[in-house]
Structure formats: structure tokens, C-alpha cells
């Protein structure tokens, strides 16, 4: 069902001339106060991974040269759903175990499904902005 809804959204968007969507939002979030919690798949990384895969496949179809498909963008890489006190653009606090076992699995699922782009998160990790975090950007995203 989720794949079908993403497929429908892709058909509608592509019919209007769009070829790229800033979706799916695959952040795992566990604080209901966060204003973007409804965009994601909830708090379970396994379910979040299944939904990320389905949405990427729905948006992109089997062949991006098909005019009814659009490129997907897995966001927000990574940890944005763990922002403190549920506040947008806030510091995110989590350890490396949580990063690898809770936060990253939906991004890996999106990547394995062939997602064409990633959007960086707005938070810091170890007081380093996610956009410039060497371990996150180079060692994990580019190599793993």
C-alpha cells in the first residue's frame, strides 16, 4: 500500500513537470513533541526501513527514464529525529550505538532500494554539524 501511494504521488508530480521529490523523510523519532514526527515512519527502525524502501521504490519505479517516475531523496541524514526537547533545528543527542542501530537502518534501506539523493540533517553530532561530519558523510555514507 505504501509503495502504491508513493507511485501515485510520483505519477501526479511527474505529470506536473516535477522530476525530484524531497521525500521520503526516514528519520526515526521518539519524541512526540517534534513537529515533524508525522512525516516519518515512527520510532521503530525495522518498520522505518520497510517504509523507506517502499517509498523509494514507489517514487522511482523500475526505471527513472520512465516519465511517470521521480527521483527520491532520503532525509534528514542523520539524527534529525532525535532533536532535543522536540524542537526543530535543535541539537540532537544520541550515542554511536543509537546512531548505528536505530537512526541509520532506514537510510541504509533507502540506499539499498536505489535512492538517488540524500538531504543532510540540520543538527550537530558530537558538536559538529551533520553536513560537515567526516565520519557521517565520508566513512558511513560514502563507504558503508
Where are these regions (language model features)?
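Glycoside hydrolase catalytic-domain context in secreted enzymes
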Residues: 1-144
